């Protein structure tokens, strides 16, 4: 389905900055030395198909002096085939805030869920319906998978700038994760410094609602903090960071001009939070036989073939097992 929406003038696009969305002067002075403990920085019933706002209704965010974090490695190119492969779940976001309409990025990771930043959802001022999502957007005239309206927001319980957004079905009763295949999350067991990565999203310095990919390398990795040498601008907030297998390893939040860009790295703590809140999120190793979370793994306690599972007929503690001394089975030599 090709959605037609009202044009947005790129001259008036209000971008969610990748440097700061908070008003405190201290937050604007983020240093790369404080990456491990940085304050958060920036860069219901069925709803009717959301509409793109007119240019005249768009207003810039205040205090956006660090909106663009363009580094010497400015390898950015447009993605025009947005509906195929790992590009399809990358999503253009508009937030209709009291002070104007702002843009950001996100990535679909479940049947009705998307990941983006806390500072993106904060722009809704507590009204989830203010956030609209357009997966696989090609440009301001072409939204091949239509639009979706948010209904619930869950912020990451840790310090990382990460949020889960749940969406209502569209007018055709389709879920956002049905019109596009949700992204695969990396288990990040092999992620390390100097690996090639990409950040894909909807930067505000490019034509409205056009998808762009930046290429670079990881330069720093510790805990939930990841830094890299590629370039982003306002509007990239919430963009997925992909590894060379096109798996999501982090969610871009912003950067420090002339120094680095950064993301929330999907480490074990973040992964556990996501699994607790998104039932159908898919991690790359979930299907592996040795993965303890795989229900087909014999060592999974929920697997009926697990020898320790009480209902396993081979379990000596199973009351139906003839070797169970408490069992009156006629085949049981200990039966009364």
Swiss-Prot record:
Pfam families in the record: Trypsin_2 (PF13365)
Entry-linked SUPFAM superfamilies: Trypsin-like serine proteases
Biased composition regions of type Low complexity, renumbered to the chain: 39-51, 286-336
UniProt PTM comment: Proteolytically cleaved by aureolysin (aur). This cleavage leads to the activation of SspA.
Annotated compartments: Secreted
Residue stretches of each Sequence repeat: 289-291, 292-294, 295-297, 298-300, 301-303, 304-306, 310-312, 313-315, 316-318, 319-321, 322-324
Cleavable signal peptide: 1-29
InterPro entries documented for this protein: Glutamyl_endopeptidase, Peptidase_S1_PA, Peptidase_S1_PA_chymotrypsin, Peptidase_S1B, Peptidase_S1B_tx, V8_his_AS, V8_ser_AS
Gene Ontology molecular functions: serine-type endopeptidase activity
Region annotation (Disordered) ranges: 34-61, 283-336
General function of this protein: Preferentially cleaves peptide bonds on the carboxyl-terminal side of aspartate and glutamate. Along with other extracellular proteases it is involved in colonization and infection of human tissues. Required for proteolytic maturation of thiol protease SspB and inactivation of SspC, an inhibitor of SspB. It is the most important protease for degradation of fibronectin-binding protein (FnBP) and surface protein A, which are involved in adherence to host cells. May also protect bacteria against host defense mechanism by cleaving the immunoglobulin classes IgG, IgA and IgM.
Protein name: Glutamyl endopeptidase
Source organism of this protein record: Staphylococcus aureus
């Amino acid at each position: 389905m090709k959605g037609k929406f009202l044009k947005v003038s790129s001259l008036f696009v209000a971008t969610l900055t990748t440097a700061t969305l908070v008003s405190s002067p201290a937050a604007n002075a983020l240093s790369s030395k404080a990456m491990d403990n940085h304050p958060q920085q920036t860069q219901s019933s069925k709803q009717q198909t959301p509409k793109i706002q007119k240019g005249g209704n768009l207003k810039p965010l205040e205090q956006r002096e660090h909106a663009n974090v363009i580094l010497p490695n400015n390898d950015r190119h447009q993605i025009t085939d947005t509906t195929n492969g790992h590009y399809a779940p990358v999503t253009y976001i508009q937030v209709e805030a009291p002070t104007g309409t702002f843009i950001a990025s996100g990535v679909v990771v479940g049947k009705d869920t998307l990941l983006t930043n806390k500072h993106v959802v904060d722009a809704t001022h507590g009204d989830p319906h203010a956030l609209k999502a357009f997966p696989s957007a090609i440009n301001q005239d072409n939204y091949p998978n239509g639009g979706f309206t948010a209904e619930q927001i869950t912020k990451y319980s840790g310090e990382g700038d990460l949020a889960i957004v749940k969406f209502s079905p569209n007018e055709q009763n389709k879920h956002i994760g049905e019109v596009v295949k949700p992204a695969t999350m990396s288990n990040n067991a092999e992620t390390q410094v100097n690996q090639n990565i990409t950040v894909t999203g909807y930067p505000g310095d490019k034509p409205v609602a056009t998808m762009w990919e930046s290429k670079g390398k990881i330069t720093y990795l510790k805990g939930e903090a990841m830094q890299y040498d590629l370039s982003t601008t306002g509007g990239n907030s919430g963009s997925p960071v992909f590894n060379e297998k096109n798996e999501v390893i982090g969610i871009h939040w912003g950067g420090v001009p002339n120094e680095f860009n950064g993301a929330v790295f999907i480490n074990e703590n973040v992964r556990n939070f996501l699994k607790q809140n998104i039932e159908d999120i898919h991690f790359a190793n979930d299907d592996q036989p040795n993965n303890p979370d795989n229900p087909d793994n014999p060592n999974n306690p929920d697997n009926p073939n697990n020898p320790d599972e009480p209902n396993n007929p081979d379990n000596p503690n199973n009351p139906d097992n003839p070797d169970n001394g408490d069992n009156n089975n006629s085949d049981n030599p200990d039966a009364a």
